[in-house]
Regions:
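General beta-strand structural signal in soluble alpha/beta enzymes
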Residues: 7-11, 135-138
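A short glycine/serine-rich beta->alpha loop
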Residues: 32-45, 73-78, 143-147
Length: 178
C-alpha cells in the first residue's frame, strides 16, 4: 500500500516602486544589484520582489494566507529584513502545515537593470531558501505602464507543493502495490 501525495499550486505577485532614497540597496532574488544603474526599491523589508512573490505563492498553495498576514509591514521586526530569511520562515510555516516545495517558477518584469547576467545566481539563492529548484526568467514591459516607464519592478511566481493526504492509493496507475 502506498500513500497518495497531495499537490497544491500557489501563485504570488509583488510590485515595488523605486525608492527616492539614493542609499537604498537593490536586492532581487537575494542578489545585491546596487550599483547597476538604478536605485533600490521602496519597502519595509529589503523589498526583494522576487523572494516576496515566491513567499506569497508558497503561502497560497499551503492555504496560509499571504506574506503581509504573517510578516506585516507595520511590525518593526521586519524593517530592512532579508527577504531570503522571510522565505525560509515561510517554508517553515508550510512545513508545519505538512507541505514541502517541489519547484518554483518566476518572471521578473524590469526595464532596468539588465537581469540576464544575474538570473542563475538568483535561482541558486532562492532554491537554497526554498529547498527546491527555482527557475527565474526576466522580461521587460517594453515601455508600457509604470513598469515600462521604469518606475518599479514586479515579479510573478508559481510554486508547486507536495504533502501527504494520508489516503491509501490502490489500483493501476494509482500506486498499486504488487
Amino acid at each position: 500500500m502506498t500513500v497518495r501525495p497531495r499537490l497544491a499550486v500557489g501563485q504570488g505577485i509583488d510590485v515595488h516602486a523605486f525608492s527616492d532614497d539614493p542609499a537604498r540597496r537593490l536586492v532581487l532574488g537575494g542578489v545585491d544589484l546596487t550599483g547597476e544603474g538604478v536605485g533600490g526599491l521602496a519597502g519595509h523589508s529589503d523589498a526583494d520582489v522576487v523572494a516576496h512573490a515566491i513567499s506569497d505563492a508558497v503561502l497560497g498553495a499551503a492555504g496560509l494566507g499571504d506574506l503581509g498576514r504573517h510578516m506585516p509591514d507595520t511590525d518593526p521586526q521586519w524593517r530592512d529584513a532579508d527577504s531570503l530569511d522571510l522565505l525560509r520562515q515561510v517554508v517553515s510555516l508550510a512545513a508545519d502545515a505538512g507541505w514541502v516545495a517541489v519547484n518554483a517558477d518566476c518572471t521578473v518584469v524590469a526595464e532596468r537593470p539588465r537581469l540576464a547576467p544575474h538570473v542563475d545566481r538568483m535561482a541558486e539563492l532562492l532554491a537554497g531558501a526554498l529547498g527546491a529548484p527555482v527557475n527565474v526568467k526576466a522580461t521587460r514591459a517594453e515601455g508600457l505602464g509604470a513598469l515600462g516607464r521604469a518606475e518599479g519592478i514586479a515579479c510573478t511566481a508559481v510554486v508547486l507543493l507536495s504533502g501527504d493526504d494520508g489516503t491509501a492509493a490502490r489500483g493501476p496507475g494509482d500506486g498499486e502495490v504488487r
